């Protein structure tokens, strides 16, 4: 189903062939090493457009699923990125999965890294996130 974000502990081995796995933190950090001036505050930096460009360049278009990991970098305040919108752009064309990492699902619509720091969260509209692992 499109326009949903699935959260799972791991992708079943039999589904790996359909998946394009993207370590977001690693991909963006590698691009930063190669193009540090793009990220400078003095430049007109559009994180939404630029990060999509980076990720689109590595997506294998024969795949039907994208598995995102290591999303913390997207929460950097300097980027001012609308993370739900960013991820949902991919959910238009692919099944999007987020591997459950160091975060919790709170209230059914928030991925929260630290309960005590509410700014460390990604908040979706209700009904967008679906947990595939019952806890």
Features from the language model and the residues they span:
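Structural motif
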Residues: 6-11, 25, 69-76, 99-102
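Aromatic-enriched hydrophobic runs in primary sequence
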Residues: 9-17, 22, 66-69, 84, ...
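Residue-level preference for the first positions of well-ordered beta-strands
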Residues: 2-5, 65-67, 95-97
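Extended, compositionally biased accessory segments flanking or bridging domains
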Residues: 1-60, 108-116, 122, 129-135
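Amphipathic alpha-helical interface surfaces
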Residues: 47-54, 67-70, 83
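Conserved P-loop NTPase "ATPase switch" module shared by AAA+ and STAND
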Residues: 58-79
């Amino acid at each position: 189903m499109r326009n949903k974000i699935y959260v799972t502990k791991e992708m079943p081995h039999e589904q790996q062939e359909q998946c394009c796995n993207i370590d977001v933190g690693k991909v963006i950090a590698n691009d930063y090493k190669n193009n540090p001036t793009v990220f400078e505050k003095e430049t007109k930096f559009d994180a939404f457009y630029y990060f999509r460009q980076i990720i689109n360049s590595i997506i294998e278009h024969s795949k039907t699923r994208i598995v995102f990991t290591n999303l913390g970098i997207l929460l950097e305040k300097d980027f001012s990125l609308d993370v739900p919108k960013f991820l949902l752009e991919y959910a238009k064309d692919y099944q999007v999965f987020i591997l459950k990492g160091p975060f919790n699902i709170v209230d059914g619509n928030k991925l929260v890294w630290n309960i005590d720091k509410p700014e460390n969260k990604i908040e979706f509209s209700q009904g967008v996130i679906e947990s595939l692992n019952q806890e």
